[in-house]
Amino acid sequence: MSAIESVMQEHRVFNPPESFVRQAAIPGMDAYRALCAEAERDYEGFWASRARDLLHWNKPFTKVLDESNAPFYKWFEDGELNASYNCLDRNLQNGNADKTAIVFEADDGTATRVSYRDLHAKVCRFANGLKALGIKKGDRVVIYMPMSVEGVVAMQACARLGATHSVVFGGFSAKSLQERLVDVGAVALITADEQMRGGKALPLKAIADDALALGGCEAVKNVIVYRRTGGKVNWVEGRDRWMEDVSAGQPDTCEAVPVSAEHPLFVLYTSGSTGKPKGVQHSTGGYLLWALMTMQWTFDIKPDDLFWCTADIGWVTGHTYIAYGPLAAGATQIIFEGVPTYPNAGRFWDMIARHKVSIFYTAPTAIRSLIKAAEADEKIHPKQYDLSSLRLLGTVGEPINPEAWMWYYKNIGNERCPIVDTFWQTETGGHMITPLPGATPLVPGSCTLPLPGIMAAIVDETGHDVPNGSGGILVVKRPWPAMIRTIWGDPERFKKSYFPEELGGKLYLAGDGSIRDKETGYFTIMGRIDDVLNVSGHRMGTMEIESALVANPIVAEAAVVGRPDDTTGEAICAFVVLKRARPSDAEAQQIATELRNWVAKEIGPIAKPKDIRFGDNLPKTRSGKIMRRLLRSLAKGEEITQDTSTLENPAILDQLKQAQ
């Protein structure tokens, strides 16, 4: 791939507040550089000393990194530990037993607090119940549940027994669930009767029944159902059991089974941009170490913080920064069942004010849709809420456009909270490139610098480094403890996907285009490599054009894809959501012309979208990710063949077929 041209310049810089630096885990850039130098000097020693200090090992490791079968790397492999013990038992031993582990807020606003002692007991009772059903170390259990304390209990109970969990997001269809049950070879499925979202009860057990009826799931002997709503469900005697009955009468202690550091803690399927889902397999030791280290470094977690990650446990963010990281750090966190727009789009700000949240971590797509709502209705604008408890903000899931970053910084953080714009992936296990809140000067739209120990670089299509200021392909040059171990059942696909021969088979391919600033070396993610457009020989990242569109005061959100064009090779197609009602006919044409001229002024005439399509919103998965493959099909006028079961709003597809 030739250098991606970066055509936007971002010059605003925001330094960490002095008061934050003074108390930070990593205070100032000298402290950051010292950690990076330590990792450069003695890479294995850097990781080993932290693994020994931060985790409880039943059997200490003597081997740090085994590269003999690269790229199937192993970390701490002769050591043994248990993830649930590290998250729960250690908190009982170090004085946190009565500390609140989870504040659960239901869809209807009811809040429940669960202490570390209570959580430990719930996990032990359920783990004992699973054991009584014959579930043991090495078995795979699929979890298809709503955001709930019980969802975390199910994950931790599997970890306690050494069973490998595979959480499937509660918005997936029966077919998607069945594919995952079959691929991972599940012996049990844990689900709920229904889930509550935005005041509506949505089926889960009924979808699980349909998935099992599709066949191939004969190994699933037990279906365990959490009674969330009390809604009517079909029941298969001998197979189906209520979660409360599985736990009933069980002792509230359960020995945590020690497993090898390399034992698969979980398999999490990514919807991979192509076809068959990929089961990303994560280890126990290396994964847990990084979950805890990044809680301390990126989120600067302190004993009195109230941490809120708005992700779902069905995604990796909900694994690392809900189910494992905060508990391993002994933190108090919020788990939220509902959606940001119910009962109105002030829900997030209201919850931050009521619970006095100090660290808030959410997705750019949520921020952008809430900007639109706030600007349309004064009553739910963040300025109506007391957000003074916040000290740190974060973003996750995709790059954040500079204008959305500025709105977040001013309106939510009141220009005093650092923003950690965290670049990472399902496959990386935890944060990779991110500002450190007490050290890194912030630049809107840039994820800044790799964490100490993460050897990120930008290369051309032959695997050679490109100079700062030239775009290229983001890679990681050395293995790190929390990295993906393999694709479940498909090691060849793992090698091809992440360690391609074209790059010499030794570099981890992130799949993102990126550029480093000439002076600061800061990384900016330009979008997925397959989101790079080639217009008349100019290569441009879609992210830049989207950022330019969103910088226009009338635009709430934009997504850009390419489509074949006889003249230019590829034409730019923009899907736009305005901060006002969707325009039509002559008005739509006029606004489309204005936006084309705006992009030409911001970036240059080469970046002008050929098609502009207006929708009430963009097609997104229920985790808020824009479904770009779907947009590519729409841009090309193709039939939609993708699985649209996770689509939040299917009706908008018709709107987006009309080009201006």
UniProtKB/Swiss-Prot annotation:
PTM annotation: Acetylated. Deacetylation by the SIR2-homolog deacetylase activates the enzyme.
Cofactor: Mg(2+)
Highest taxon in the source lineage: Bacteria
GO biological process: acetyl-CoA biosynthetic process from acetate
Record-listed ATP binding positions: G397, E398, P399, D421, T422, F423, W424, Q425, T426, D512, R528, R539
Keyword field: Acetylation, ATP-binding, Ligase, Magnesium, Metal-binding, Nucleotide-binding
Pfam families noted in UniProt: ACAS_N (PF16177), AMP-binding (PF00501), AMP-binding_C (PF13193)
Single GO MF annotation: AMP binding
Binding of CoA, residues: R197, G198, G199, K200, T317, S536
CDD domains with a match to the protein in the record: ACS
InterPro entries reported in the protein's UniProt record: Ac_CoA_lig, ACAS_N, AMP-bd_C, AMP-bd_C_sf, AMP-binding_CS, AMP-dep_synth/lig_dom, ANL_N_sf
Family, as annotated: Belongs to the ATP-dependent AMP-binding enzyme family.
PANTHER family (alphabetical): ACETYL-COENZYME A SYNTHETASE, ACETYL-COENZYME A SYNTHETASE 1
Protein purpose: Catalyzes the conversion of acetate into acetyl-CoA (AcCoA), an essential intermediate at the junction of anabolic and catabolic pathways. AcsA undergoes a two-step reaction. In the first half reaction, AcsA combines acetate with ATP to form acetyl-adenylate (AcAMP) intermediate. In the second half reaction, it can then transfer the acetyl group from AcAMP to the sulfhydryl group of CoA, forming the product AcCoA.
Name the UniProt record assigns to this protein: Acetyl-coenzyme A synthetase
Organism annotation: Cupriavidus pinatubonensis (strain JMP 134 / LMG 1197) (Cupriavidus necator (strain JMP 134))
Gene: acsA
